[in-house]
């Protein structure tokens, strides 16, 4: 079983934490990760594209010219697809791009992604976040102290409201509640930062039959993951209300 050093926000070592083999020690399955990420990105598509067919385009009710005797080809409407201003033949219509992905495949993909980051030493564990007030400068200093470079995924718990507000303005940092941990966000960032609180929670989520967050991503923006981050979301809504005032 692999282990990782636990650091304080200032970068000092306070001990070590064991990484579960079934989460951070599996052989990465590239094809499964690809399929799950493809499904996640497909589920994010709005699918609202729409074109008008010949029957939906306004006008074109009168026959342009008589059927015979003009020497021209037969025409019944000016809204046929071959005409300028006519309808579109076989054009896109609104559709759902969501794909059904087995829960075991979702679980394997997330474990593969976390194992890949752990193998490269890109999983960092902090004992806890200590932000008295939200301050982005303190977040920048904390990332430098713990050695998080490049694109960083920071996984928060329910009570890390000030930390969430401190990190969320950084363009190279993606903030995520532990209940929303998913394959795409892990692979889309170079480093994954957990706290002692969120690390075991994350292991339990992956070890289950399937992660709730990734199942909801299949159905494109499910409310289930939002319910698990009520405290953080409520803090965001309070901020927006203050800005409007």
What are these regions (language model features)?
Residues 47-51:
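A short, aromatic/hydrophobic, helix- or strand-capping loop or linear motif
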């Amino acid at each position: 079983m692999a282990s990782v050093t636990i650091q304080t926000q200032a970068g000092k070592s306070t001990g070590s934490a064991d990484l579960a083999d079934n989460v951070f020690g599996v052989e990465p399955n590239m094809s499964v990760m690809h399929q799950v990420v493809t499904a996640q990105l497909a589920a994010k598509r709005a699918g609202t594209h729409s074109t008008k067919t010949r029957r939906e385009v306004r006008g074109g009710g009168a026959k342009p010219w008589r059927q015979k005797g003009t020497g021209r080809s037969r025409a019944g409407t000016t809204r046929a697809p071959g005409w300028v201003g006519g309808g579109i033949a076989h054009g896109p219509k609104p559709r759902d791009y969501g794909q059904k992905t087995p829960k075991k495949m979702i679980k394997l993909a997330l474990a593969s992604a976390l194992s890949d980051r752990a193998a490269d030493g890109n999983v960092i564990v902090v004992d806890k976040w200590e932000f008295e007030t939200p301050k982005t400068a303190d977040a920048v200093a904390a990332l430098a102290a713990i050695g998080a470079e490049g694109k960083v995924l920071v996984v928060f718990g329910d009570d890390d409201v000030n930390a969430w507000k401190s990190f969320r303005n950084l363009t190279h940092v993606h903030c995520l509640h532990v209940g929303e941990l998913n394959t795409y966000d892990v692979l889309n960032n170079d480093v994954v930062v957990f706290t002692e609180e969120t690390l075991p929670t994350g292991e339990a989520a992956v070890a289950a039959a399937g992660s709730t967050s990734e199942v909801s991503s299949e159905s494109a923006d499910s409310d289930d993951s939002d319910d698990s981050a009520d405290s953080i979301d409520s803090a965001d809504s309070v901020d927006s209300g203050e800005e409007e005032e």
